[in-house]
Design a protein with these regions (language model features):
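Hydrophobic, aromatic-rich alpha-helical transmembrane segments
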Residues: 1-4, 114, 397, 401
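Sec-dependent N-terminal signal peptides of Gram-positive bacterial secreted proteins and lipoproteins
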Residues: 3-24, 404-423
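Residues in and immediately flanking transmembrane alpha helices
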Residues: 15-16, 76, 206
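Active-site-adjacent loops and short helices of periplasmic peptidoglycan-processing enzymes
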Residues: 23-176, 180-189
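Domain-terminus/edge residues, biased toward the C-terminal soluble/receptor-binding domains
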Residues: 155-156, 169-172, 176-408, 420, ...
């Protein structure tokens, strides 16, 4: 009898497994490429993915972070900046058989040339040189800055061991993380111009090398005469090592929709070309319009503290947003919650967000995106406690923090008889993105 019951249970489990509704993948299933991720370039919302959190060797798409940090340091002031090539820039690459532009120790290279050499020629010696520029003068310092930026972005599946992407057991990223790294880099002055250049770039002679060097676009998907040409791709970085195989990250735009697409560990080069085309064709066919998500009227109270004392309460609400939803989905398929700290301390960037979550069903990846929430009453609270006129109205945390970060942390309540006498304005930190 027990045996019969066991057999019956087994049959029932099998029947349930066969006829239970299966979760259908929101995007194409790729067999020749291990992992991919497609996000909306504007909000960072994940649209489709396969193994997007798998930690893989990135190869030269590493240089997106290197170039982003160099652009951040330069703040658009490229002209007149000269970098001196060190012994380590050149000889740390000995025996790697990696891409380079034959920089020589002691050579002085304009920053602009180093940027385009690293971007277009995928020069590992150029990446080393740039890492010293935004680090503390050493490659190790540059790598530390890269990992600090990873932490700042809240990414969980990335660690860099070098600025160029030569395979190392401690050097890895994921498709999701790399998509968010590119999204961040695109906000840095000059990066998008660098990333999207198609024309040949001439590097003039230097104080050591008398001949010009020329850098060409290496991505066949951006060459009009190539059979692999994809007009929607605006900018890209390609990567390859024997261990990483083929990796790719691009910015693509069509009919006002901007996407970031990352593929990693494609078996052969033609697999990469074909799979990127498949992914972009899918995305642009299914995502054609942005949808306004109205404010839902969520309200919560948040304690504000300064000078070690509570100052009062402010009101936090969801602001509404605009999301790229798959055709067939509506604002009704999006839910929102508020994400607040225990208290907001003056002098810090307020980590106050509305989290919008898409129920993608079988049409879109179910994913979330964080948007700065709206804070009401902060200026009035400060006026009551400090006597400082900051204006009135409702501000998002990004704008409010820009007014407040410079306020002295020695601010106390009126009962203490102390008022703030110094106020400076500076920009708030960018919010972290997570899926």
């Amino acid at each position: 009898m027990k045996k019969q019951i066991a057999v019956l249970c087994t049959v029932l489990l099998w029947v349930c497994a066969v006829f239970a509704p299966m979760a259908q993948a929101a995007g194409p299933a790729l067999s020749a490429t291990e992992a991919y991720c497609i996000i909306d370039a504007d909000t960072g919302l994940v649209l489709a993915q396969q193994n997007m959190d798998e930690e893989l060797h990135p190869a030269s798409i590493t240089k997106v972070m290197t170039l982003g940090l160099a652009c951040e340091k330069a703040q658009g002031q490229w002209d007149g900046v000269s970098l001196e090539v060190t012994h380590e820039d050149v000889y740390s690459l000995a025996g790697t058989d990696s891409s380079h532009i034959a920089l020589q120790e002691g050579e002085h290279v304009p920053l602009t040339d180093a940027l385009y050499a690293t971007m277009m020629a995928s020069a590992n010696d150029g990446a080393n040189l740039l890492s010293e520029y935004f680090g503390d003068g050493t490659i190790a310092g540059g790598v530390a800055a890269m990992n600090a930026q990873v932490a700042e972005l809240g990414l969980k599946h990335t660690h860099f061991a070098n600025p160029h992407g030569i395979s190392d057991t401690d050097h890895y990223t994921s498709c999701y993380d790399m998509a968010q790294i590119l999204r961040w880099a695109l906000t840095q002055p000059g990066f998008e111009t660098l990333f999207t250049r198609n024309e040949m770039y001439p590097m003039k002679p230097t104080d050591i090398q008398p001949k010009e060097r020329y850098f060409h676009q290496q991505d066949k998907m951006r060459v009009g005469s190539s059979r692999y040409y994809i007009p929607a791709i605006q900018g890209s970085k390609i990567g390859y090592t024997n261990i990483a195989r083929y990796s790719y990250v691009c910015l693509a735009e069509q009919n006002g929709v901007r996407l970031i697409c990352v593929t990693m560990q494609s078996n052969i080069k033609t697999d990469k070309y074909n799979d990127v085309r498949t992914l972009l064709d899918y995305a642009f066919a299914h995502y054609t319009n942005y949808t306004d998500i109205p404010a839902q009227g969520l309200t919560r109270e948040l304690t504000v503290a300064g000078g070690g004392a509570p100052l009062g309460m402010v009101t936090v609400t969801d602001p509404g947003t605009r999301l790229l939803l798959a055709d067939g989905l509506t604002a009704g398929d999006v839910s929102v919650t508020l994400e607040l700290p225990e208290q907001y301390v003056l002098g810090t960037s307020p980590a106050v967000y509305a989290v919008y979550t898409v129920n993608g069903q079988d049409k879109q990846e179910s994913a979330s995106v964080r948007v700065p929430a709206t804070i009401t009453g902060l200026e009035e609270l400060l006026e009551r406690n400090t006597g400082v006129q900051l204006g009135s109205g409702t501000r998002s945390p990004g704008k409010t923090a820009g007014l407040l970060i410079g306020i002295s942390l020695g601010c106390t309540v009126l009962a203490a008889g102390v008022t703030v006498v110094v106020m400076k304005l500076r920009k708030a930190k960018k919010p972290k993105h997570k899926h």
